[in-house]
């Protein structure tokens, strides 16, 4: 799973004995409509409604992920190990609001941890360094958007997290023929 403020990318991978994988299912949860601003104070009824609506929908997304885990009989759920502190990101007021105030990352992570302990699958937190870059380079194409490509890379890392020498994938020039730049 690739967690972003506006989108959650999900991919379900199946690995064989040779550590090769195929993508069984991929999905994007679009949360951008939930992140609108009310242009009112945080104590206003509309602002409280939007905040509660956002939290409810994020919890529903977690339940949908859990349904997919049960349907595909997954044994591991791989997420990014994020520890982002609130700060000025120097990309504008709207971006800072989205990353620091609106994004309920811990709500999603804690709910997924709770569901994994109830339903018995392993939750693996992986280092997200360059997951978007590597994911787009190796798996990105017109049918696989950015958040799906990085979720594939996060899943690949999570599958072999404790194996030595498996963090970065093997790169070949054939991966570049799908790229548009």
Model-based region annotation:
Residues 1-181:
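Positively charged, helix-rich recognition surfaces that bind polyanionic ligands
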């Amino acid at each position: 799973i690739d967690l972003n403020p506006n989108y959650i990318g999900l991919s379900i991978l199946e690995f064989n004995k040779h550590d090769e994988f195929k993508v069984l299912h991929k999905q994007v949860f679009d949360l951008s409509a939930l992140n609108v601003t009310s242009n009112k104070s945080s104590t206003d009824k509309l602002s409280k409604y939007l905040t509660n609506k956002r939290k409810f929908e994020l919890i529903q997304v977690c339940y949908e992920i859990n349904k997919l885990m049960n349907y595909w009989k997954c044994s591991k759920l791989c997420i990014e190990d994020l520890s982002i502190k609130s700060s000025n990101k120097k990309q504008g007021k709207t971006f800072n609001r989205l990353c620091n105030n609106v994004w309920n990352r811990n709500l999603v992570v804690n709910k997924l941890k709770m569901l994994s302990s109830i339903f018995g699958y392993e939750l693996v937190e992986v280092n997200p360094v360059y997951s978007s870059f590597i994911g787009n380079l190796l798996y990105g194409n017109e049918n696989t958007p950015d958040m799906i490509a990085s979720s594939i890379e996060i899943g690949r890392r999570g599958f072999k997290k404790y194996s030595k020498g498996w963090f970065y994938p093997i790169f070949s020039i054939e991966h570049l023929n799908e790229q548009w730049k």
